[in-house]
Amino acid sequence: MKETSKNQPSEDLKSVKRLHRHDKSIMQSILKFLYQPIDPSSLGITRVLFGFLMIFDITQERGMVYINLRWGDPKACEFPLLSNLPILSADWMHILYLSMIAAAIGICIGFYYRIASIWLALGHWYLILIDKTAWNNHTYLFGLFTIFFSVTNANRWWSVDGVLNQKINNVHIPRWNLALFQFQIFLVYFLAGVKKLNSDWITGSSVTTVGSHWVFAPLRLLLTTQQISQYVLHYGGLIFDLIEGYLLFFNITRPLGIALGIYFHICNSQIFTIGIFPYAMLATLHIFCNPDWPKKVIMRLSPRWRKYFLLDTPPKYSASNCYYNDYNPDDTGSRIQQFNSQNRLTMAILAGYVTLQLFLPFSHFITQGYNTWNERGLYGYSWDMMVNSWSYPKIKILVVDLSNGKHFIGGADSRFLRWSTYPSMIKQYGNCLAKQMKTSYEIKQPAVYLDIWKSMNGRFRQRLINPKVDIVSAPWSPWKKTPWLMPLLANLTNWRNKMPELKKRYSIDDKSRIIRFYADFPGYTQEVPVPAALQANLTVLEGQVEVNASRYIYKLNPKMTIRLPSNVTHTVTVTSERPAAYFYRIENATLARILAEEKENIKNRVEDYSPKSYLTYFSTSVRFVTGNIIEFLKSKVLIYYHIAINTFDAIQNIIESENITDSTLDSVSPSNN
């Protein structure tokens, strides 16, 4: 017994040493994997495509085309993430965007690649930080890509840098350069699928208006529009996102993954207005293939075309930042012979990044101040792709001067309404509006009340925030739940399935009749004007309401309907103890008459269905398609002409401003006697 206890410490020490050697062996294996040499051509192709696409992204979706509209009004409200971050003037914004285009071109052709990548990353993230209204998933993803290119060696193949410096031309790159992109793309697909595992998406309520799109025309031979929306768009989109990353990862399923990815992203590019995102995802499908796949493809070209590409295999031990397993001590080539602290630091940074990306999409229990109903956090890093669709907001603004009780009523600028969905930006808008009222209208103590009505995923349109709370003095913190955010009326969600039937029953399928569904909280009142050209009926679905119109008060219970007077503003107050739901049937009599006359003209028109008419129909269709293509090209030419003129004017303004400043300084400088 004594002898056993005496030897126990040495046995424990041996166990610790074995465990240490085991951990060291695991770390060594990970480092060998990360620094394994691979061919640079796949990442080089990704660089070329990304740089090319970013040129169009900067000019259009990043907002260069409407700089003067967005940044040219000094009174416009801004929504930066960091309030102390300076915002450039419109003229200097043109210079920033122009430099970002130059950086994107530099990335595309691989010229001063590192500097171009870093500058594009700085410019892209600056635009993100100064304008939360522009945040979305692909903006965030492109920002991550700019960082990736800043730290990887994507200019080692088919780049101007490689032509100018043969030492980096067609040399190996460490595997982590490509694995970083592979991890992020896999995560985008998979987490987009995970976020779709909610009741709204599974019941087909998130995206309901695109089932009739022309891309689904072949499917309409077998399925109805509703079935396409439910089974193809929602179920198909969910399954695709969950499995696409796995399909691309394994060699045996990769062809299927690429085929599905091409079809999916091409459809998205036609259905949704989401900029270059579908094309960027198309451009990254290949990164899961073998790293030297571009060279294998090019080898199949004729010799006259091959000469424009560098097809040689990278020489043995060609990169000093790669680890070669077949190391020969007698060889003097440049390579990693033993991992150092810098290599281990890179591994730690990559591990930290992976952990962060896995945590951020589910971190909204920390940043509760950015949450809105079931949309969690600042839209972008959550990968909630198409999960929530919002109706066009109805906004009423009331400003009260607390010093004298004067009221000012107005509406919001309809150009930029993204702020109306998120409490953090609503708070910023209220503060901005209060500041404007102080300076422009000399209001001493402004209080701002916002009545914002929105519908999410086909539910009733309801209040987003409490209209009785002064936004200026209301508390808001990124770490706490927003107290003045009204709850989602989830108990009324079951009515969503009955809304299509109600629309079909009460509304003829034309543009002259519409139905608007509303839900409100007990004790709250809504003011609704009915223009003279419209006829409106109100029907209660659930709860009790009191309607005050033309000095008459009507108390309505479920299934009761009232005809509302035109050219009068009425109020609807919820008098029941639980929330009430009701809808308006609105008809434009003038538009209805015009549409009826047009239908009658079509009915009386005699069509000739001879073979000549079919040829005429075909030629008309060809002219229509050709005309649309020409109009599209014209619009793009006009956009870039507009950008060029505005940028030239901005440069002139800056030069003139500098000249005026210099002349002013010269005029006030003391003369030398």
Where are the language model's segments positioned?
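Alpha-helical membrane-anchoring segments
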Residues: M1-N673
